């Protein structure tokens, strides 16, 4: 699975395009009220990635074991310090409503999902991130 995220920003414009393999879609995140940058910061989007990953993976893993999940709520919290500091004390909570199974089965499912959630495991593994290329245009 090849995943790509692209941001295009200039005064008053903020476009976000996401793709997984050949599936391309946009999400609406307005620019900052000052006109430059995103109204959602990177920390918020990182935590959104954690919440989204876990939510989607609960449905995926439930389907694998034949559990019918009706709804999932995930909330992620943490703190960022000063400029350049990584997040700390990142934690999340989930609430799941399911049919035709026991509370114990759901709890097992949720614990298992935590071990296979790819975004969580990426952060836990400390994957390397590198700046590959920079293009610059100087005007006037």
What are these regions (language model features)?
Residues 53:
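Alpha-helical metal-binding/catalytic segments enriched in His/Glu/Asp
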């Amino acid at each position: 699975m090849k995943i790509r995220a692209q941001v295009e920003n200039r005064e008053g414009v903020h476009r976000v395009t996401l793709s997984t393999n050949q599936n391309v879609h946009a999400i609406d995140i307005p620019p900052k009220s000052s006109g430059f940058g995103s109204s959602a910061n990177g920390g918020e989007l990182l935590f959104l990635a954690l919440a989204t990953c876990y939510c989607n993976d609960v449905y995926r893993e439930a389907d694998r074991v034949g559990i019918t999940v009706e709804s999932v709520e995930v909330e992620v919290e943490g703190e960022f310090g000063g400029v350049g500091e990584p997040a700390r004390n990142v934690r999340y909570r989930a609430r799941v409503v399911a049919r035709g199974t026991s509370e114990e089965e759901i709890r097992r499912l949720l614990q298992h999902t935590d071990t296979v959630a790819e975004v969580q495991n990426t952060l836990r593994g400390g994957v390397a991130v590198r700046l590959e290329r920079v293009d610059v245009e100087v005007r006037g």
